[in-house]
Amino acid sequence: VCSSDLGAQQYYHIKPDITTLGKIVGGGMPIGAYGGRREIMQMISPDGPVYQAGTLSGNPVATTAGIETLNILKNDPQIYERLEQKTRKLADAARKAGNGHVCVNQIGSLMSVFFTEQKVRDFESAVTSNTEQYADYFGYLLDRGIYIAPSQFETMFISDAHTEEDIEKTCKLAGEALCSLDF
């Protein structure tokens, strides 16, 4: 749900057999959901032989949070565009400050900064990253009040709660952090 109201399905123009949704469907609460083609979903109880249940299944607090989150997203169709603009601004600033020494991957409101000069498209290219430099980058930002993913192998997420001032401050400090590193 981080790139559009139908997530990667809409972004990449695909129709999957099964869709899984994580915390966003519960407004950040511990919940997940899945759905799929009719013939697959008919295999799930009570219509089919596959039983699915769990401790958190149908948790009223999480489902209420999820309904409210989905209502907010539905009633504000520009939210995805705002998220992408904010994230693109951060990604562009990191690319510029990294001066070819980092690979910044970004889509929608998701981004990652890899400390490698090559494109990162898979695990093999990701592990060429310099984790010590990332740790220094992380520490520089954390010491100045900016919390990013503690590992370059995790995705950073931008929220609509992040203000333009937050984005500007992060761009400035990320640039300083990257310029302080010895590439």
Language model segments and positions:
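Conserved N-terminal phosphate-binding loop of PLP-dependent enzymes in the Aspartate aminotransferase
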Residues: 1-183
